[in-house]
């Protein structure tokens, strides 16, 4: 009995737990099995009684009662009749909730094609039948007949006949001699009669025998879909519907508005149209209406069902009464407002609130101030429970009343409830995981949330009206996770780069900086040579010092001697005397006592960088608790001293250099000189522009340097003592506020501005803000500012979209095992750009595991294979002069799904080895995406002031001796050494004989060193003009022209403003007469024959379009002289506008517009016969393999000559290389290095630091797929793409059976494509192109094993990462045990049954 009572209350079965989801095409039987009844009428509800109409779209008999446990006519009410079906109205007495999950159906009078399988490209029905979509539509929409059985007539099977042709054929051959049909019935019949096995066999044979290039691809597509139908158990005819399911009424509600009107879901309108047309069709068929009317009605039914499934996919969009397109079933799923993204991936939650934030400087780092009113509302259930437990109230109702009246006991209980109960604060946009953190609430008066100043950087919050949301973790587990994982004290380091994120900023920095300034000649200074008072300024303990400060006998900045007492390396007390200032001593008072944290940490000028380094040191050595306490103390100290210092901002603090105008005048003269050169025809318009812009940029920098010199100078008083430091300089130098670029605009000159197009305006703004701009300057500067504001708005969206794509591609990269055991690795070197080390090796390898022993020169092993490189190893690595380290990387990780902890290395946010189940993919995506948004929002801070960044020289970053590889240098007429070859490299050899650096020289560069020279650090090796690419003679001789005819391939342009002529190569391919010219310059000997070069070919130099010729025919030329030059594009400003699209372009693996052509092998270049308007280049490889041909458009500048030798991977034609080419030619490691460096360069330009491993994780996800080059002994076809892991599994099986394994090459997919091709169809569908993904998944009968994070969020289970991964492991163990128990049971049962069967019959009974 008890059991029954329990069942009574427990109506609906608990949601069952599942491990996978399968999607397939539903058969008509399946649809009927879901349905609770057929819907025959289009009516919804009765307008007078508001009761649903019987057999209508809201029918209670089919879908269930409107009110809980009450039938429609009211005969049966209450729980006791549960399950009874009313004989009057036919409604089952049960919960009204069943109206959310009971479905109905509509029996169609004529079959209808499912638009998804018809129109979703590629058309599945079209592929199966091998018919064009156009033809299919003509059949389905009743325009043409299709022949099904030709019989003995000359018609062909599946031939299309128009109405007239059909009638004619019937007359000619007789009505019964052949069968032709029209509409969805025809297609259904053809699909039913398909012999899938036969077609598959025929296709396989054809693929094997075909010779053409394109045909196998087409056949493979068709074979794939046929095999999909065979394997999935879907029947082709199910793509034609005979029954339409109707979704439950509560999912398409009809809600009464006031005023007697109704708001309805669009689906009801769409269903109504289908039912109306279906009923009309039934009636017409019964009435035996003429064929043409019935056909028209069938066509309309087809269109109505199309609109229901996917409105607007074909034909006109069906609109409602207010001219707005109706939302069909497909629209319900897709897009930001669709079911996936709106309701499944992001839900609104209760127990949350939001309010404005204000600063809370007296809070501890783990606290936040929560307004009492908010807390009372958020913690209501807890308060009710506690009131009840304490006996203040007997019922919830009483408790409610107490809380509403805000009785004093309620506040006491609120205090108890809140104690130790963390809340989560979140600021939108949440760009990375630090955008939501847990704090302990502290009750405050007022209505604003108080936030600790040090966590602002993580939230990117400021107090100018930002709002934040509060969420309450309810369950004990949630509170535990919030405290252990999300507490602000546990998030001290930034997950993107492992540096502290809890860094003081603004006032705190200013206060600490002020505290650590040293002043000369301040009061109470210690002078060693002062005989009268040798002990002045000598202090031994802090009390004494504080007294002196209070008595003003010493100032914060005086130089003093101080006895510091701390701990030695073994923890024993030591003391040491330092030269320092009282301010720094006060600062040292907050340092934790630790042998590794000496006084030197604070005995320096504290800028923001130094403070960050200090926090880092404390965190690494003293652990988390000490660091948190230290941060809080340092904050209090900074604030109090900034307040006492009284640093202010005055107009006289902006010092304009006195020599400003002389510098400006010098530059003006220089610009005038360039104008003159241009007028004289020595330089082109473009070159003049570049030089002018350059000159002004240099002037601007020089002025800025002068101004900085003036501002940073300390003012002295009449005694020669330091009076005060410039306030603005202190703010900028400390990193509290403002940057040198802003100071430059305030007090030097605003400098160059950019046009909205990104070009730099030639005339700079010479005034600064202190002097004020004149009207013209102001107008010029508005350009940049306006562009900045417009860009910000646009790019925030772009950046968010990039983050979304990154998260989607990386969401299933989770740490799954400790070590995958691979021996592979990737090589890491320091990154050097224009002679500067931009990323030192030590920083790049820190926290990564080695792939081979790291050995010093004396043979001692610094780090063993598989160990992690820690901070303690770095000094030894640097001392050993190691240039290259092979480390483990996720790119080579062999873990099946996910990655292993060893390949990933250190968890940057914790500074420890990464934990199992850490979602490293999502962290990588957030780390790359978050600064994208930051940067885009930051463009306008410098008001579009132009930055010119182009390197035009190489400086040595090492000392050593010079060696020159592939030497082809020549002395030109000016006596300079010029690089005349493409592969000249300068090698710097260290004193120990190792190669320290290799610099490949630009062709045409002036070389400042020669073989055997010794070189110092910072010395110039070579330089070149960044704005032009020269074509250089390699031998001495006389200039000759070839195919350079005036007006055909060359033109003398006279510059209008100067009247000077110059010769430029023009596009000669335009007319047929000139298309086979090959314009070139020759170097001739005395007899007028071309000089032979060392490699055997003539000294002939082909010229590209737009080359400017510098010498006349007959002029003498020396090797190394410039024959002609090609202008490169003028310098555009590089701000992150170039940045974000560039990052997206790299991650999407798009082919660049003018892609570089890369040599596939090492070999020799020959020019072959031209082909149409392309040049033919042949590369004959050194290894004797087949020659490779390249066709290059004629205007492209090929900087190779006949007979040049190229190495594998050299550029034959300049440009950005296509990542796919790098992968194919140089392999995965080179590709990864290229992508990492290119992406890092964009971020580095903006001063954002991201660890390489994040980019590697994303690149790994882009390399998931393999293209099959040889199917081996498997049934996989050549040219197919499958997952890496699948390939490994197949090969394991094949090798075990002794068969030939499959061969494949890795394929690079862009992030969008990779996301759409993930194994999980749920994840792909929730990303983009929902319809296409679901259609394809259904045809293939795909199974989603719910391995990634996203699909688990969507189905509402715990994600398999973090604490959820442990839960998943425990579940799988339980499942294994269950299955074992079941096996044992069934074995026992079988044994018992066997025993029984052996007994004689009587005994068995």
Swiss-Prot record:
Its cofactor is Mg(2+); Zn(2+). Mg(2+) binds at residues 462, 464, 466. Signal peptide: none annotated. Pfam families: RNA_pol_Rpb1_1, RNA_pol_Rpb1_2, RNA_pol_Rpb1_3, RNA_pol_Rpb1_4, RNA_pol_Rpb1_5. Keywords: DNA-directed RNA polymerase, Magnesium, Metal-binding, Nucleotidyltransferase, Transcription, Transferase, Zinc. It is an enzyme of class 2 (transferase). One of its GO terms (biological process) is DNA-templated transcription. CDD domains: RNAP_beta'_C, RNAP_beta'_N. Zn(2+) 2 binds at residues 820, 893, 900, 903. It catalyses: RNA(n) + a ribonucleoside 5'-triphosphate = RNA(n+1) + diphosphate. GO terms for cellular component: DNA-directed RNA polymerase complex. Zn(2+) 1 binds at residues 71, 73, 86, 89. GO terms for molecular function: DNA binding; DNA-directed RNA polymerase activity; magnesium ion binding; zinc ion binding. Its EC number is 2.7.7.6. Binds 1 Mg(2+) ion per subunit. NCBIfam families: rpoC_TIGR (TIGR02386). PANTHER family: DNA-DIRECTED RNA POLYMERASE, DNA-DIRECTED RNA POLYMERASE SUBUNIT BETA. Belongs to the RNA polymerase beta' chain family. DNA-dependent RNA polymerase catalyzes the transcription of DNA into RNA using the four ribonucleoside triphosphates as substrates. The RNAP catalytic core consists of 2 alpha, 1 beta, 1 beta' and 1 omega subunit. When a sigma factor is associated with the core the holoenzyme is formed, which can initiate transcription. This is DNA-directed RNA polymerase subunit beta'. It comes from Methylorubrum populi (strain ATCC BAA-705 / NCIMB 13946 / BJ001).
